[in-house]
Structure formats: C-alpha cells, structure tokens
C-alpha cells in the first residue's frame, strides 16, 4: 500500500486537534519549492535539520560538563534528541502536530557555541558592539543562511512555522527573515511545548550527569523538597533495590511526573478557555495568557529545583574553572582571527564584504566543536 502526500494530509486532518498547526497550513517557505510526493512539509524540515552540518557537530559540543571524558555523559546532540522525544510525546498526547514540535526541538540548539553557556557568554560580550550574539538567533541564522547544502536557496528553507518556533519571546529578530507575524501572534503551541521539553530534559539529565560525575551526592539532592518527595516515593515502592538504581528510577519518575503534569494542565487550560483554533491561541497570547505551563504547585517546585541546581551544581568550582578555560579559548580565537582574517576558511571569508568581519568570525567560532576549538587554540602562535 502506498500513501501519497495527499493521503497523509487527509489522515492528519482526522487526528489533529483544531488548535494544532497542520502540514497543510505550514506558512509556506521563504523560497518556493515543489511539494514532495510522499513526505509532508514538517517531515522534510525534520530531515533537513537531521542532515545538516550544524546538527552533526552537536555531538562534539558540551552543555555543562566541559572537557569531561565519558561515553555516558550528555552532549548537545543527545540532549537535543531527548528534547525531541519529549516534544513528540507531549504533542501527540494533546492532538498537536508532533512533526512540527519535533522539528523545532531538533533545531533549537543548532546555534550554540562550543563550551556550553560559557561560550555564549563570552561571545555575546565580544559581539556586544557589533550586533550581539544569542544562540536562539544564531540557530535561525544557521537554518536561514549559514548552512550551504542546496543549489536554489541559502540555509535549509524550512517552513515558516518551524522558523517561528525557533524565535524566543522578547528577542529582537531581523525583519528580513519575514517572521514579524511571530511577534504579533506568539508561538504555536507546538513551539511552546518544545521550549518546556527543553527545560524538563536538561534539568533531569543535569541531575543524572552531575551525580554520575560526583558533583552531586544523594545527600545534596535530598535537600531539595521536590527531589526528596519523588525519591521517597520510589524508595517506598522499590524497597529491595540499591541506591544507584533508586536514583536513576527517581530521575525517570521525576521526568514522567513533569511531563504528565504539563499535559494535564495544558489540556485543562484548553478546555477552560474553550480553545477551538490557532486564532484563539493567538488572542490569549496578546492577552499575556500562557496556555502551556505546569500547574501552579508543580511550577513552583520545578523552579525551586532549578534554583537548587544552580547553587549546588552549576556554581561548582570545577565547572567554573572549566568554563573559564572555555571562555579563554574563544576569546583568544576571536582576537587571533580579527588580527589575521586571512586565516579564516574561504567559505566564511567570502562573506566578509556582505557582513562585518566581526559577524563572520562570530559565525565561524560559534560553529566550532569543543575539541576543534581547543585544537586550533593550542596551535596558535
């Protein structure tokens, strides 16, 4: 049996909720293309992101534990895949377009620098007088212009709805990207879900990786009421298991708890506000009402857990020292290429006349992996 694009579109209309973004209403692409015979628009977006050079490099970019060696610790790619999985689950449970949520999730970290948030912090400072640097905006730059894989257009030419999902509220974006509608009507519910899935994923895997690496201990974790509540519940249920299995079980339970609360609370709000269309969602956005959120009780617990991790994990002296080293590498590379622009690869150098030297260096350095940046740094004269 063969399902054509039209068959798939018809099947989609039978399963999506009325407030979901359908493939038939994807907003189009900036550069017109012929539709694929058996792939839907958001499927093509997902595949283009997965096959992009920027996505491949995510496996060699770290988030929190810079320069850590170990096969079991997360990197940007494993984090992204976890976010995509959560996004699919939540979107499907709510009758939303899981392909769109997945595509947004897969692209959300493409613009991250090497060396995690330390890299963004130093690059943002270096670029503050030259247009700035912010990883969400950089993700948009990658998929709209920096990636070079197609003969008829720059970037990946993703659907506008996918691009809108990469825009963060309050950020200043270039209007030439033709995405002003996002500022007025807000993100899709699929995009909001990808954002919240990101929060769930990084919080839980930072707990696991921090514990695995010895930066967090059970005694530390039990200081947080939310963790203690989940851990004690698992301990009562699994009395015969050891501490390691119990901690891993608690992390899974915490993830499931947050996902379930989010799904139930969004469903409750959709029903309470009688949401019947994407227009209804846009109206609520203009009224500053966020339909996608945890319940008040869980939201408070989750915020406290994230604050706890900031104090107990992210400010650990070892992590700060590694972050400082990452910043030193990026600052040194930036300064070197400013003084020696001839050393910039030709694929970047040819854009200097169209954009500033600062922007080209920023794009080049931001696209490096951790180990490539360190390798270039160590080879500097």
Curated annotation (Swiss-Prot):
CDD domains: HDc
InterPro entries in alphabetical order: dGTPase (IPR006261), Diverse_Catalytic_Enzymes (IPR051094), dNTPase_2 (IPR023023), HD/PDEase_dom (IPR003607), HD_domain (IPR006674), PHydrolase_assoc_dom (IPR026875)
Keyword match Hydrolase: yes
GO biological process: dGTP catabolic process
Occurrences of domain HD (ranges): 76-203
Any GO MF annotation of the entry: dGTPase activity
UniProt keyword terms in alphabetical order: Hydrolase
One Pfam family of this chain: HD_assoc
Domain of life of the organism encoding this protein: Bacteria
Family: Belongs to the dGTPase family. Type 2 subfamily.
NCBIfam families: dGTP_triPase (TIGR01353), PRK01286.1-1 (NF002326)
Name the UniProt record assigns to this protein: Deoxyguanosinetriphosphate triphosphohydrolase-like protein
Source species: Leptospira interrogans serogroup Icterohaemorrhagiae serovar Lai (strain 56601)
């Amino acid at each position: 049996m063969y399902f054509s694009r039209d068959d798939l579109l018809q099947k989609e209309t039978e399963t999506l909720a009325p407030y979901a973004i359908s493939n038939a209403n994807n907003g189009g692409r900036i550069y017109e293309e012929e539709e694929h015979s058996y792939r839907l628009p958001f499927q093509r977006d997902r595949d283009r992101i997965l096959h992009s050079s920027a996505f491949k490099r995510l496996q060699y970019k770290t988030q929190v534990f810079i320069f850590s060696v170990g096969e079991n610790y997360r990197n940007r790619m494993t984090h992204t895949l976890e976010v995509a999985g959560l996004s699919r689950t939540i979107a499907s449970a709510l009758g939303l377009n899981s392909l769109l949520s997945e595509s947004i999730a897969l692209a959300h970290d493409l613009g991250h620098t090497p060396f995690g948030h330390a890299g963004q912090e130093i690059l943002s400072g270096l670029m503050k007088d030259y247009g700035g640097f912010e990883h969400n905006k950089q993700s948009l730059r990658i998929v709209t212009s920096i990636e070079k894989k197609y003969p008829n257009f720059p970037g990946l030419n993703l659907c506008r709805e996918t691009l809108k999902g990469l825009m963060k509220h309050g950020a200043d974006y270039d209007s030439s990207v033709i995405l002003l509608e996002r500022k007025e009507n807000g993100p899709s519910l699929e995009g909001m879900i990808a954002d919240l899935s990101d929060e769930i994923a990084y919080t839980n895997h930072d707990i696991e990786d921090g514990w695995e690496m010895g930066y967090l201990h059970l005694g530390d974790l039990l200081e947080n009421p939310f963790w203690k509540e989940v851990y004690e519940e698992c301990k009562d249920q699994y009395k015969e298991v050891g501490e390691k299995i119990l901690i891993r079980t608690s992390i899974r339970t915490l993830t499931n708890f947050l996902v379930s609360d989010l799904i139930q609370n969004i469903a409750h709000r959709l029903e309470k506000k009688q949401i019947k269309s994407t227009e209804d969602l846009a109206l609520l956005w203009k009224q500053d009402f966020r339909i996608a959120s945890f319940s008040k009780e869980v939201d408070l617990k989750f915020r406290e857990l994230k604050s706890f991790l900031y104090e107990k994990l992210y400010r650990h002296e070892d992590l700060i020292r590694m972050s400082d080293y990452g910043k030193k590498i990026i600052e040194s590379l930036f300064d070197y290429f400013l003084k020696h622009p001839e050393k910039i690869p030709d694929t970047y150098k040819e854009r200097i006349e169209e954009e500033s030297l600062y922007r080209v260096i920023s794009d080049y350095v931001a696209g490096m992996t951790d180990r490539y940046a360190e390798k270039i740094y160590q080879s500097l004269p």
